[in-house]
Regions:
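Canonical Rossmann dinucleotide-binding motif of NAD(H)/NADP(H)-dependent dehydrogenases/reductases
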Residues: 3-36
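Substrate-binding pocket helix/loop in short-chain dehydrogenase/reductase
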Residues: 96-97, 101-107, 198, 202
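Alpha-helical segment proximal to the catalytic Tyr-Lys
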Residues: 125, 167-171
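Short, small/polar-rich loop/turn modules that mediate ligand/substrate recognition or access, typified
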Residues: 170, 175, 231-233
Length: 267
């Protein structure tokens, strides 16, 4: 059966977590006919998902440029080209503004700004016949979430880099877009979402009445990378309308729910 991404080579960074958003995208892209290279830090998990989707893998620490370049080179060596680069790593750093440490600020800048920036720098020269860059961002790049200033700032910053890429490389047939989920049901968030009242506190702010899933994000990514898409430089808000409203404020939810929110990792 013909798929929307037949024979496109997709490199998905951030696909080492069991059933995380990157792995869900890898499965969906493979179903659409793409050739998959998954990347991340957990080699055992990468082996498992790459075997499942009939693809390959590369171990990569996004904070180290030599790992990023080696990963991209491996994808090109395996398939002779690169059509799609997806950046799905992140760290949901939570801290009151005045309490953010220099060490943590350097860490989140490396994970959510410098690393993705260098990933895009590595992918673009390999896209000889055009291609697609996708950044998994966050609704919090647009609307507030208490005690997440550094997280929100780095997400918003890399969104602007995406627009810059779209502007500078459009004439080479390269499109660049970002996707902004809100709170998303994943294995990583399952423990926190089990806290009494947490899901309801968030869900009431979603006009569509439910929390998002990784499958929602994967479907949007397939569209953005398909030949039928004419979007570039856009931030796709895949969050059920959350950005029409707001995230719950910390004082509006009880202590047990607030503690669970504090454990959530970002997209």
């Amino acid at each position: 059966m013909s798929g929307k991404l037949n024979n496109k080579v997709a490199l998905i960074l951030g696909a080492a977590g069991k059933d995380n958003m990157g792995q869900v995208m890898a499965r969906r892209f493979a179903q659409e006919g793409a050739k998959i290279v998954v990347a991340g830090r957990n080699e055992d998990s990468l082996k498992e998902i790459s075997s499942e989707v009939g693809g390959d893998y590369a171990v990569c620490d996004i904070t180290k440029k030599e790992y990023i370049d080696a990963m991209t080179s491996k994808a090109v060596d395996l398939h002779g080209k690169l059509d799609i680069g997806i950046q799905a790593t992140g760290w949901g750093y939570l801290s009151p503004f005045l309490e953010s440490t220099e060490e943590d600020l350097v860490k989140i800048m490396n994970l959510q700004f410098k690393g993705p920036y260098q990933f895009f720098q590595s992918c673009i020269p390999a896209m000889k016949e055009g291609g697609n860059i996708i950044q998994i961002s966050s609704a919090t790049a647009t609307i507030m979430l208490d005690n997440h200033a550094a997280y929100m700032g780095t997400k918003a910053g890399i969104d602007h880099v995406i627009r810059t890429i779209a502007n500078e490389f459009g004439e080479k047939g390269i499109r660049a877009n970002s996707i902004s989920p809100g709170l998303t049901a994943t294995p990583m968030t399952s423990d926190a979402m089990a806290a009494p009242g947490l899901e309801d506190a968030f869900k009431k702010e979603y006009p569509l009445g439910r929390i998002g899933t990784s499958e929602d994000v994967a479907a949007a990514a397939v569209f953005l990378c398909s030949d039928e898409c004419f979007l570039s430089g856009q931030n796709l808000q895949v969050n059920g309308g959350l950005t029409l409203r707001r995230n719950p404020r910390s004082h509006e939810i009880d202590a047990s729910v607030a503690a669970a929110v504090a454990k959530l990792e970002g997209n």
